[in-house]
Structures are given as structure tokens and as C-alpha cells.
Amino acid sequence: MQTLADLLNTIPAIDPAAMSRAQRHIDGLLKPVGSLGRLEALAIQLAGMPGLNGIPHVGKKAVLVMCADHGVWEEGVAISPKEVTAIQAENMTRGTTGVCVLAAQAGANVHVIDVGIDTAEPIPGLINMRVARGSGNIASAPAMSRRQAEKLLLDVICYTRELAKNGVTLFGVGELGMANTTPAAAIVSTITGRDPEEVVGIGANLPTDKLVNKIDVVRRAIMLNQPNPQDGVDVLAKVGGFDLVGMAGVMLGAASCGLPVLLDGFLSYAAALAACQMSPAIKPYLIPSHLSAEKGARIALSHLGLEPYLNMEMRLGEGSGAALAMPIIEAACAIYNNMGELAASNIVLPGNTTSDLNS
């Protein structure tokens, strides 16, 4: 059985030679150089991922939704009843939530995974990786032990790698858990070094008069638990949550297979920050789907060095933004594989080069 350290060491580097070949190929297509903007850059990024073997393409698609409750809910940082986590998870099994509808539109399968829902019995239809019935209250204790965090990371990495073996080439991450923007803000504040007041937002419509308490809870959680910002596992274990750990595991697992991962919103940015602390090599595999409307989104993305492809003013979570952006990935692959070449049409444009995939 591989350890977490073993798996982190297997993450392959992006192939610069494949990216150079892709650049030359794209520059030789029936268009002025650079005229398809970020779509071209995305195709080149995909070409460099070893799991795609130098040719941007999409096989099976999967959105992995990590569902968990949070002890910090007891601090009054969310207005939704905690039971909504279990109710919505069950709705996901029926295909009626936002991410399920958008994933179906994109032709992606949704994997609903219980990593820490607070119910007496597992919910039928969910993939059971439950660690505990909710995380600890980070305002008064760590979210979980380091051992719990490492085991869940390893379990999710292995699950993700198994999906890749079965033909999934494009992953999306999502989450579900009442009060989970609070630990996400704590992670972002810890790793970026920004004050909680700069990153704490309203989450799922928290009244503005309750925002001061939420900021205070995040500040207390960080002061009490003293997470090490250089240690992603430590941050997740002390001020994170099981859903955040799970998302980090998907990112690490997909990257270990040389495959792309579409981020979702603010929660996924926080998980990505922690995952990048564990292995900076995963960063080229992360594709930001959309700009979350949550307050600390820009701060987190700036620290990651990522610019989202969409700005739809969304803050639903669940993986909805990741599902929505999947057709953009397919569009980047389509232009690479299906457009004609300038040379074949005897067109010469300034700055364009003849396509040569073999050079």
C-alpha cells in the first residue's frame, strides 16, 4: 500500500516539449496567431499534461462532490440548519441539485461522497468515505487529527486514480457542507497571510450583522490552533474540514495521473492552496472554472496565480462552476484537433508558422 508521501512523489512534471509542439501546431491553424486568446493557452496547457499524451482531448468526465458537516456551525456562522447537508446530499443522489443538472448538461458523472456528514446512518446512494460525524469545532479544537486528514487524503487520491484508470480524463471538484465557508476562510487567511476580515464573506446569505462574529470565529480558530502555513496537511487538519481535505485529495490524485482538475469556487480555492503546499507540482494541472462571488476569492486566486475563465457571479458551490466550465475544456480540445491548417490552404499570415507535430 502506497503512503501519502509516496503518492505525492509520483506527480509528474508538465512536458515543455509537448507544449512547444502544441504552440507551433496552434500557430499554424486557420486563424491569426493568438486570435482565439485563452482558448489557445488552455489547449497548450492540456497538451503538456502527461496523462493526455501530448494531444488535448476529453474522455470521461467526473465531478467529485465531497459532503461533510462542520462543528464550527455551532458558533452561529451559518443560517442554514445543519441538517441541510444530509438533505441536499440525498437530493444529489436524485440528480436534482444545481451541480447535477449542470453536470448532466456537460455529459459528466457526479460522484457524491460522504466524508463526514452528521447522520446516524450512512445515506443510501452516497459513496461512503466518512471519517466522522462532522469535524471538530475549529473555534475550540482542531478540525481533525493529522492521521485522519492523511488517511482521507490517501483514500480520495486512490479513488481518483481508480477513476482515471477507468477512462476519466477530466475531473471537477465540488463540496457540500453547512458553515464550510468558515474553515475555507481560515485556510485562505492562514496560507496567504491576509487578515480574516479581508477574506471572510457572507457564504450562503449570512446576514451582514452576523459577519463580525464569523470574522471573530475565524480569527479565534487560527489563534487557538496555530496551523503551520507551510504544511498543507497541518492547515487542513487544524482549521479545515473533511470536505476540504477530500477536494485536495481529488486534485492530488488527478495530478498524480497527469490529468486536469477543474476548480469550482471559494472552497476549492482554499483546498487548492493547501494541496499546493503539499505538492507545488500540482499547480499546472489546476484549471480555475469561475470567479466565486465570495469575498476572499480574488485573494486566494491571486496567491495561486490563477485567472478564472468565467465570471457568472456564482457562489452555489457543489462543483457547479466546474461542471459549467467543462465545455470550455472540450472547446479547447476541438480547436486543436479539428481546425484546418494555413499551409493546406496556401494562406500566409504574419506571425503564423506551418504546423509540424513531428518537429
UniProtKB/Swiss-Prot annotation:
<keyword id="KW-0169">Cobalamin biosynthesis</keyword>
<dbReference type="GO" id="GO:0008939">
    <property type="term" value="F:nicotinate-nucleotide-dimethylbenzimidazole phosphoribosyltransferase activity"/>
</dbReference>
<dbReference type="Pfam" id="PF02277">
    <property type="entry name" value="DBI_PRT"/>
</dbReference>
<dbReference type="InterPro" id="IPR036087">
    <property type="entry name" value="Nict_dMeBzImd_PRibTrfase_sf"/>
</dbReference>
<dbReference type="InterPro" id="IPR023195">
    <property type="entry name" value="Nict_dMeBzImd_PRibTrfase_N"/>
</dbReference>
<dbReference type="InterPro" id="IPR017846">
    <property type="entry name" value="Nict_dMeBzImd_PRibTrfase_bact"/>
</dbReference>
<dbReference type="GO" id="GO:0009236">
    <property type="term" value="P:cobalamin biosynthetic process"/>
</dbReference>
<protein>
    <recommendedName>
        <fullName>Nicotinate-nucleotide--dimethylbenzimidazole phosphoribosyltransferase</fullName>
        <ecNumber>2.4.2.21</ecNumber>
    </recommendedName>
</protein>
<comment type="subunit">
    <text>Homodimer.</text>
</comment>
<keyword id="KW-0808">Transferase</keyword>
<comment type="pathway">
    <text>Nucleoside biosynthesis; alpha-ribazole biosynthesis; alpha-ribazole from 5,6-dimethylbenzimidazole: step 1/2.</text>
</comment>
<comment type="similarity">
    <text>Belongs to the CobT family.</text>
</comment>
<feature type="active site" description="Proton acceptor">
    <location>
        <position position="318"/>
    </location>
</feature>
<keyword id="KW-0328">Glycosyltransferase</keyword>
<comment type="function">
    <text>Catalyzes the synthesis of alpha-ribazole-5'-phosphate from nicotinate mononucleotide (NAMN) and 5,6-dimethylbenzimidazole (DMB).</text>
</comment>
<dbReference type="InterPro" id="IPR003200">
    <property type="entry name" value="Nict_dMeBzImd_PRibTrfase"/>
</dbReference>
